[in-house]
Amino acid sequence: MSSTPTAEELALQNTVSQSASAHPELYHTVSHASNNSYQLPQLSRSATSNFSTSARFAARYPTTAGESFQNLTPVNSNPSNQNSKTEPNPDDVEKCIQDPLLQVFPVVEEPERFVFSIDPKSPLIAVNWPFKRKLKTTCILAYVALCSSFASSVFAVPAEAITTVFHISLTVSLLTMTVFLLGYCSGPIIWAPLSELSGRKPPILIGMLGFGIFNISVAVGKDIQTIMMCRFFAGFFASAPLTVVAAALADMYSNKYRGTAITLFSAMVFDGPLVSPIVGGFLTKSYLGWRWTEYITSFMGFFALIIVYLFCDETYSKAIIQGKAKEYRAITGNYFVHAKSEEEVLTLSDIAKNYLLVPMKLLFTEPICFLITLYSSFVYAILYLLLEAYPIIFGEKRHFSMGVAELPYIGLLVGVFIGSGINIAFEPWYYRKCLAQGGKPDPEARLPPMMIGCFMFPAGIFWLSWSGHYSYVNWVVPALSGLATGCGILLIFLQCINYLIDAYLFRAASAIAANTIMRSAMAAGFPLFAVQMFHNMGVGWAGSLLGFIATALIPMPFVFFFFGRKIRRMSKMAVDF
């Protein structure tokens, strides 16, 4: 008694019929249990069985654009009987491979290994995504970076409040910011290699989960030891997005738009530390108290975890290909399908040599990475030093109350936005330079905005120092210095990051990790001596000392602009297109 064919059987029959019409010499008719006739290849029983699974997969899950399998050397399931097997006709096998039905798995006597690959122009690759998808992912990643940087200085104002709660000195209380930044310093050693092994998304998810948990722990901490320890681990997990986000943006954007995307990331890196002291000051002064600075930070982290998990896509091409190969294995049950990168057999020694130690190797053996990182680290550390200097200038000298004393940070914030605008306006010029050399990145063409910033940065510091030194000078004057200082900091830091990405394009995550390690170490130390330096030397001369150092670093972008290409040619790890 015959039964009505199912929709799956009809789809399979239709697909096979089309294939049989294309290659009738390879097929013969067999009867199915439901008395429906099917055209199957003229192969052995075992091959026909293997084909059945492949055919059903091809009918239900056709290969999408840009996906393909590359045939490797056959691996016999029973090598001892290899000589007794009938070898398939190579011409027939080639026809089967070309057949739309059999393009998923070539049908041969023995199982084979297949390398799953994706065409570089496939829409699966992040750089080929539609603009809306890129914009969505970029906004999510920017928010994650903002959460991380927000937490770094949100404890700057509460640090003074906890001196009376836990009966500690001001210097000890300032360690709450230092240990967080030391966590920043240690985290990239783990997150950068992990992002190159497993993709960009897993480190961010793990980082935001740990970030939220340890910020809650700080909020409920009963003693200073608990707070210090939890702040360190919060910084360790918070360093994940700072290490990975820039590399993820490099995955998504070509030379034309990468600089604009990195501008958004850099703005978030600086906006967080400038906004959080204002929030922290008013929260600490309110009935909520200093603990709510950490509650709010943890809520931000958990929200970031949710939106990254639900809406953020993986951007690393190697991880995307591995994920698709895993999906095909699960659907077809053929565990010979794999990505090329999965053929690598990594030992602990290989992981340490090729991944864990790469950031340190870049930092201490590559002059480009070391000098560029040194400059960006100095301006980044000055930002955290100013978080301690502003309360002296506006709180102690001008008697602003808590919260209000932090409002002049808005000047720095506006300066950061001005610097971002300058960089975005510069991007078309950079893109034309890239087109002039065949569309390849030109790291030295990134540096003209830094040449502007290297003058604005020391000018802003001198402006703040001597206008802030005299209490009779209206507070607006030193507050406006933040326009020059913030703009200079952003232009220098941003182009340093862009230069590292372009110069070490295939090691971008490791280069950013090296940068994060050094700049976090310097930022951790600067606030510890800021208060004593500004008290003992006076605001004018303490600031001038920093201004003189910034002035001495002015030649840095000019040296790399004129000699950077020659230096890169001598490098073992930098790219030279």
Curated annotation (Swiss-Prot):
Domain of life: Eukaryota
Keywords: Endoplasmic reticulum, Membrane, Transmembrane, Transmembrane helix, Transport
Signal peptide positions on this chain: none
Keyword Repeat: no
Entry membrane topology: Multi-pass membrane protein
Keyword Lipoprotein found: no
Subcellular location(s) per record: Endoplasmic reticulum; Membrane
MF terms (GO), sorted A to Z: spermidine transmembrane transporter activity; spermine transmembrane transporter activity; transmembrane transporter activity
GO biological process: spermidine transmembrane transport; spermine transmembrane transport; transmembrane transport
UniProt main location, coarse: endoplasmic reticulum
Transmembrane segments: 139-159, 174-194, 204-224, 232-252, 262-282, 292-312, 367-387, 402-422, 447-467, 473-493, 504-526, 543-563
Pfam families: MFS_1
Biased composition (Polar residues): 1-21, 68-87
InterPro entries xref list: MFS, MFS_dom, MFS_trans_sf
Region feature (Disordered): 1-24, 68-93
CC per GO annotation: endoplasmic reticulum; plasma membrane
UniProt family annotation: Belongs to the major facilitator superfamily. CAR1 family.
PANTHER family hit by this protein: MAJOR FACILITATOR SUPERFAMILY, POLYAMINE TRANSPORTER 1
Full protein name: Uncharacterized transporter C36.02c
Source organism (scientific name): Schizosaccharomyces pombe (strain 972 / ATCC 24843)
Taxonomic placement: Eukaryota, Fungi, Dikarya, Ascomycota, Taphrinomycotina
